[in-house]
Amino acid sequence: MLISKRIVMSITNEQILDAVADMSVMQVVELIEAMEEKFGVTAAAAVVAGGAAAEAAEEQTEFDVILTAVGAQKVQVIKAVRGATGLGLKEAKAVVDSAPASVKEGVDKAEAEALKAQLEEVGASVEIK
């Protein structure tokens, strides 16, 4: 009576990759089909769900300068708002009186930082969004 023994060899990932690298394209396709059938899976490409996250990660290029509080030097803040925006006295006073209010919208970072520094210099509290 003959007893067959099954000898299991330890095959490394490196050896598997080398074997696949030596195959022709048709052999690789057949291997993939056999693996799909044996394991009940498909070799469809994974869908990357990072499109929205990538957009959010982009650096912001436009900023809004928000006057959050006027401080003690209201007249100086009005003058600074007028100078930065080109508004008339009445319009600039209305912006300052309605704090928190947007002083300038859609400006680049450098301009937003400069305006913030100018308004803070005269005692206003400013936020950049």
Swiss-Prot record:
Keyword match rRNA-binding: no
Q: Which residues form a coiled coil?
A: none
> What GO MF terms are annotated?
mRNA binding; structural constituent of ribosome
Q: Which CDD domains match?
A: Ribosomal_L7_L12
The source's domain of life comes to Bacteria
Q: What are the annotated GO cellular component locations?
A: cytosolic large ribosomal subunit
User: What PANTHER family does the record tag this protein with?
Assistant: 39S RIBOSOMAL PROTEIN L12, LARGE RIBOSOMAL SUBUNIT PROTEIN BL12M
Q: Which family does it belong to?
A: Belongs to the bacterial ribosomal protein bL12 family.
Query: What is known about its subunit structure?
Result: Homodimer. Part of the ribosomal stalk of the 50S ribosomal subunit. Forms a multimeric L10(L12)X complex, where L10 forms an elongated spine to which 2 to 4 L12 dimers bind in a sequential fashion. Binds GTP-bound translation factors.
HAMAP family reported for this sequence: Ribosomal_bL12
Functional note = Forms part of the ribosomal stalk which helps the ribosome interact with GTP-bound translation factors. Is thus essential for accurate translation.
Q: What is this protein called?
A: Large ribosomal subunit protein bL12
- What's the source species for this entry? Photobacterium profundum (strain SS9)
Q: Which gene encodes it?
A: rplL
